Amino acid sequence: MLCVNVELQERRYPILIGSGLLQDERSYPIKRGDRVMIVTNPTVAQFYLDTVIYALEKRGCVVDHVLLPDGEKYKTLESLNLIFTALLQGNHGRDTTIIALGGGVIGDVAGFAAASYQRGVRLIQIPTTLLSQVDSSVGGKTAVNHELGKNMIGAFYQPSMVIIDTLTLNTLPKREVNAGLAEVIKYGAILDYEFFEWLEQHIDELVALHPEALQHCISRCCQIKADVVARDETEKGDRALLNLGHTFGHAIETHLGYGNWLHGEAVSTGMMMAAALSEELGDISIADVSRLEKLLARANLPTVSPDTMQPEDYLPHMMRDKKVLSGKLRLVLLKSLGQAYVANDTEHTLVLNAIRRCTQTD
């Protein structure tokens, strides 16, 4: 087992990474008599809910659970209210612990519930997808979507622990594995050139879920994110760099309808658009753009815009991005592979040109 610590100004919390952690009662920092509410969905529940309940009950915990509908389109206030109703009907107090057992949607909604219920209860994240293991479960971002924009309603709320059991990836559909690799590649592209080179050498092993490669990959991604979050917990500076490709990607998700493209798929194409714009601005070489494209393609990820979107469809969505300040578009771009920066008020004509370069042609 590996442990990565997230060091915040006022406290720290561990990320445990290993195989078989869910069934090990020692993984859970919960004492006899504690009350727990597990938030999950039917897809995850069929594989792991009984395992987690059994481990917690061996510790003497009182365990309830609530099932949310499965999918990005259910990352809503309605799903949030299902959690509140279950907590209230079960007479859960401020001393309860919410466990988010699932992928990014479950983690975000359950995390927001933990931040909100009785003004805050303890949260444990148990991510079961590659994307949530390397990204969304770490760092305290919680949110639900609005029909006009992704992650528009939420809070920063840190978990007390993250438990990453790599065995959960064995039941993950290949498309979900590939989507998670988009966020993995992002870390190398923005902050760690050596890791990017390692990914070029080992991406095939990751696609095939080789255990040693996976454990190294997940721990490296978590360490990179932990370091960034330690410097900038609430995204006032460096943490914005973690959003490479996300402004373009969120536009795709919102325009197509949540869930039609997976988040990682949209981020993949978004990274290509950001790289194309970086090259237009003279920051990155065409050779490095090509390296990024080839790596994403080897991970079976899209690198061009959906054929149902036109370049002009992007900007209205992008202007509602949370990084927009005073009506000016701010984008995460690349100075080189392994070095990102935030560009302020980039000309819209250049943005459109970059999108056009990543548009499908017959």
Curated annotation (Swiss-Prot):
Keywords: Amino-acid biosynthesis, Aromatic amino acid biosynthesis, Cobalt, Cytoplasm, Lyase, Metal-binding, NAD, Nucleotide-binding, Zinc
Keyword Ubl conjugation attached: no
MF-aspect GO terms: 3-dehydroquinate synthase activity; metal ion binding; nucleotide binding
GO CC term, one of those recorded: cytoplasm
List of residues binding NAD(+): 70-75, 104-108, 128-129, 141, 150, 168-171
Cofactor: record remark: Binds 1 divalent metal cation per subunit. Can use either Co(2+) or Zn(2+).
A biological process term (GO) from this entry: aromatic amino acid family biosynthetic process
Reactions accelerated catalytically: 7-phospho-2-dehydro-3-deoxy-D-arabino-heptonate = 3-dehydroquinate + phosphate
Coiled coil: none
Chief place where the protein resides: cytoplasm
Cofactor entry: NAD(+); Co(2+); Zn(2+)
Pathway: Metabolic intermediate biosynthesis; chorismate biosynthesis; chorismate from D-erythrose 4-phosphate and phosphoenolpyruvate: step 2/7
Highest rank taxon of the organism: Bacteria
Compartment(s) of residence: Cytoplasm
Residues that, per the record, bind Zn(2+): E183, H246, H263
Enzyme Commission number, as recorded: 4.2.3.4
Similarity remark: Belongs to the sugar phosphate cyclases superfamily. Dehydroquinate synthase family.
Biological role: Catalyzes the conversion of 3-deoxy-D-arabino-heptulosonate 7-phosphate (DAHP) to dehydroquinate (DHQ).
Protein name per Swiss-Prot or TrEMBL: 3-dehydroquinate synthase
Organism: Haemophilus influenzae (strain ATCC 51907 / DSM 11121 / KW20 / Rd)
